[in-house]
Amino acid sequence: MKKVTAMLFSMAVGLNAVSMAAKAKASEEQETDVLLIGGGIMSATLGTYLRELEPEWSMTMVERLEGVAQESSNGWNNAGTGHSALMELNYTPQNADGSISIEKAVAINEAFQISRQFWAHQVERGVLRTPRSFINTVPHMSFVWGEDNVNFLRARYAALQQSSLFRGMRYSEDHAQIKEWAPLVMEGRDPQQKVAATRTEIGTDVNYGEITRQLIASLQKKSNFSLQLSSEVRALKRNDDNTWTVTVADLKNGTAQNIRAKFVFIGAGGAALKLLQESGIPEAKDYAGFPVGGQFLVSENPDVVNHHLAKVYGKASVGAPPMSVPHIDTRVLDGKRVVLFGPFATFSTKFLKNGSLWDLMSSTTTSNVMPMMHVGLDNFDLVKYLVSQVMLSEEDRFEALKEYYPQAKKEDWRLWQAGQRVQIIKRDAEKGGVLRLGTEVVSDQQGTIAALLGASPGASTAAPIMLDLLEKVFGDRVSSPQWQATLKAIVPSYGRKLNGDVAATERELQYTSEVLGLKYDKPQAADSTPKPQLKPQPVQKEVADIAL
């Protein structure tokens, strides 16, 4: 035990010495208006907004890896779903009286419409090129079995017809119809099994890594933008004039430099929490993080791939977190179609796929250790789920696949380790600590530094999330006529809700579909699927939304 303690102490001292050495060597200082930490889709999106809003502002982006979009934004490290709640059942929880709540589904869909408009605008500007390289039409389906689940899906479908955003969704309990929609899912299935499915033709598969690379490539064309790769942030210090001095180490030659920035955005994915803590702002003390990874089964066999064109999402088991929702998806990656099934949760103390095993420990402080303990005690179902996932065997994963693909063959599939997600834990006056759903922008009172924490729905809502950040940090500028006009040019529906306005919804979907090369047929009137007799349900507490 003494040897272990001594080893840990020496490692801590060594890491601190490296950090101090980097600070000492950082003699030259670079000045920039905006410093973007992290080369993922969030930094790329914010940089693209600011390039249009304030083209004269200088920007510097630093990324610790040798290329951009290599962590969570990488197409192989996420599910590639254009999350719009067309099929994700966790966005429509069932209330105690049996009714279906659609508020979150509407909000998620509204957010994705902003992303579609943002991307379409960038295509028109020539910033994004060849839309098929990053977004493709892939129908979105929900699929369930068993009487209770069928009743739930029928009720969900009926509830969503209240929203203009979900017009065009179809519902069926007919085996033949569902087989036509998703043959791979139905072939070999018990013909007596009670099943149901919904299908929306305008679903999408998105390669967020490709979007990120193209956005950053466009930013690099301007002389007042600098991209520094293999560059790791080692220290952040607020100056007396409310600017920030950020020490950045070059991981290739061991040198370091100071970057003086008027505004700092920490868009470093799983590393954002530690950097936010390093900044020393009081707001950082309220947060902790818990990492969860994911694995997928992948098939590139043409016999499988050519037999499936849909993203098919199931229903999580009672008490399990939404990230446990199984889905079998058509993906377009590296220019070719593949099929993925999962996710299967994994556990590592790393906050990034290319992170350190010390990430969890080094982010635990006297301020956030108690909230973390409270969350662990209050979310035993989540803990139990993670333990069960870690214990899964190869056979267990294959049996899970066969529930969605009855005729699956082991030799057609391989296991792939996707990215890490860090779930937000926030201090709470009543409960001590709570799991926060979705993502959260954390900034200082002066609006000089901001970080994005959280994971889901993540990249698919990068455009609206960065809009929220602009409003939070640059509120005075956002309200100016100049910024208002520019933002409405980028996002035509900015400041308005599409939900409830059929004409506006159809207009924006038609516009973005034409520009992005996506399928869109004006939806017909909703069918007359009968509403089910709703059964009262036990009240279920909200669980962590950490879907991949």
Curated annotation (Swiss-Prot):
**Gene Ontology molecular function:** 2-hydroxyglutarate dehydrogenase activity; L-malate dehydrogenase (quinone) activity
Tell me the InterPro entries matching this sequence.
Answer: FAD/NAD-bd_sf, MQO
* EC class: oxidoreductase
Q: Report any one BP term from Gene Ontology.
A: tricarboxylic acid cycle
Q: Which reaction does it catalyse?
A: (S)-malate + a quinone = a quinol + oxaloacetate
The protein's Enzyme Commission number:
1.1.5.4
What does the UniProt keyword field contain? Answer: FAD, Flavoprotein, Oxidoreductase, Tricarboxylic acid cycle
Task: Please give the superkingdom of this protein's source.
Answer: Bacteria
Required cofactors, per record? Answer: FAD
UniProt biased composition (Low complexity) = 530-541
**Disordered, as annotated region:** 521-548
Name its pathway.
Answer: Carbohydrate metabolism; tricarboxylic acid cycle; oxaloacetate from (S)-malate (quinone route): step 1/1
Classification via PANTHER family: L-2-HYDROXYGLUTARATE DEHYDROGENASE, MITOCHONDRIAL
**Entry's family note:** Belongs to the MQO family.
Q: What is this protein called?
A: Probable malate:quinone oxidoreductase
